[in-house]
Amino acid sequence: MSSLYLATVDAFLRNPHTRHRTCADLRRELDAYADEERREAAKAIAHPDRPLLAPPSAPPNHSHLAARETAPPPAATP
């Protein structure tokens, strides 16, 4: 890296006003992005008359999962 770049970064990190301003700018951008994401998510919420996903035709069979989820009995301590 060039020494000019490193000197600029060092000056930035040592100046609390610059760091604070950059942090505030980033926070403002993140807040705007989060607001936009919330608006898009609100638009995508399914309406009762038009659901996003079709209901399943049959309930899923989870019997094979139950056998794997049972834990072995604890070992006896001597």
Curated annotation (Swiss-Prot):
Residues 3-36 are annotated as: Active domain. The keyword Magnesium does not apply. InterPro entries: Herpes_ICP47. GO terms for cellular component: host cell cytoplasm; host cell nucleus. Plays a role in the inhibition of host immune response. Binds specifically to transporters associated with antigen processing (TAP), thereby blocking peptide-binding and translocation by TAP as well as subsequent loading of peptides onto MHC class I molecules. Empty MHC I molecules are retained in the endoplasmic reticulum and ultimately directed to proteasomal degradation. In consequence, infected cells are masked for immune recognition by cytotoxic T-lymphocytes. Interacts with host TAP1 and TAP2; these interactions inhibit the loading of peptides onto MHC class I molecules. This is ICP47 protein. It comes from Herpes simplex virus type 2 (strain SA8) (Simian agent 8). The gene is US12.
